Amino acid sequence: MKRVKAKKSYRILLVLALVLAFASAKGQQVSPVDFMRLNPYQMNANPAVDLPYQSVMSLVIGNIDLNVENTTLRYDNLFEFDAQGRPAIINLRQFANSMKENNYFGLNAGWDLFTLYKRFDKDLWTFNWGVKVQGDAKYSDGLFKLLGYGNGSFLGEDNPVKINMDLNVMAYQEWAVGYQMNVTKQLSVGGRAKLLFGILDVKTEDCHAELYTAPDTYALRLKENVAMKAAMPNAVYVDESGKLMGNGPFSMGELFRNPGFGIDLAAEYRFDEQFSAVAAIHDLGFIYWGKNNLSLTSQLNDAGQFYDDGSFLFSGLDWKQIEQISSDQEYREQFLDTLRQYFQLEFAPLQKYNTALNTNLLLRGNYDFDDQNRFSAQLQGCFLGSGFRPAFTVAYCGSFFDNLNVCATYTMMPHSYDNIGLGISAMIETCNIYLTTNNLFGLFKPMNTSGFNARVGIVFNLFMPERHYIDESGIPEYLE
């Protein structure tokens, strides 16, 4: 096979970029589907890719995606186990020691309901309709330390336990129209324009608390502040008295009432038949929440003896009060009602607002050993409500027997370096069946893994004249 030599400077720059990416990345979930050369859904990661298909179609089961990231919560850290490996004792101190100062939990899910790709001449048009759920929470270790060590470990105003949380949850529909073209034999570009309809949104604007014990009197002093905003379906609303209700009417029209817009853009450049590079940006956009918005706030109220200068000050109970609480149900309920008055949640209608999508950036380098085997290195990062989260992945993808695609990946994530993934895609006539995960260990220990991604689907690749991605000249066939 005739080979075209790339300029030496191109290769040096590509290798240098990948080395810098490896040195700076920490991690976020990546799916082996993104690297599968025979899987049409690789376009989700790289809209500029030149697929070797004339048409692609899927309905309901084309792509089902579940993604979990959990930096520190572990089942094994919560318990002490007996000789048979069964949980015997809850060890809160051990659990608290296993936490980081800042911890993260993320949950993302996607379900493609309809997909259609159609090639006209050398250009590819795409259409996707699906539902996405994105959620992430960043939280401190303060609450777990308080449970594990007790308030006696936090003596003095200068040594409080700090409890913080940043929560973001969003669900929406996505209707996307895309276009891919080969500008030259070396350069391909692609993109998608997305019409979005928000279903649900919850976001914290402030959520923190501080507690310490006075070293002389052992009184507990607590300060807290909570502020959240949300957009809910009509089934959830705030009534005239300010109470949150969940018995409102619901109609299908509510699924189309919070409009938004987003775009994906990508470019792929082939230095020669072996080296190529990809740059992409996904989910650059927003959703306008204009219906049934509400706010939630919680600040300490002056409800009596335990209120002191904006703080909840608990100096203890005398024996008579303790006896009444333990033996008198009416007194106990009255006491608890009084405590609740200090920490009342207030709901109120909220004006219209916008939220940005979780924008994702991607840089990838590919090396094709031959027309059946590819090695890739990828740096990826996502702007979440709780901050920026990067990722680094190396991948191998092999094609066998013209109808079997196997992909192996390794991904680095924050506080986790054991994410070995595997994906298999099989062609049966025009039917492409695939199953992937980015963490094989997570399949066997889901309660003790730092991250897990699973994707499964069945896609129909129609009118495929040639299954080889690269022809005898070493150039992708649709570039001729």
Question: Residue spans of the language-model regions?
Answer:
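Transmembrane beta-strand segments that form the barrel wall of outer-membrane beta-barrel proteins
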Residues: 252, 372-383, 392, 402-415, ...
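Outer-membrane beta-barrel translocator/channel fold
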Residues: 101-105, 138-171, 231-237, 409-480
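Transmembrane beta-strands of outer-membrane beta-barrel pores
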Residues: 63-67, 131-135, 195-199, 281-288, ...
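Membrane-embedded beta-strand positions of outer-membrane beta-barrel proteins
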Residues: 59-61, 127-129, 189-191, 267, ...
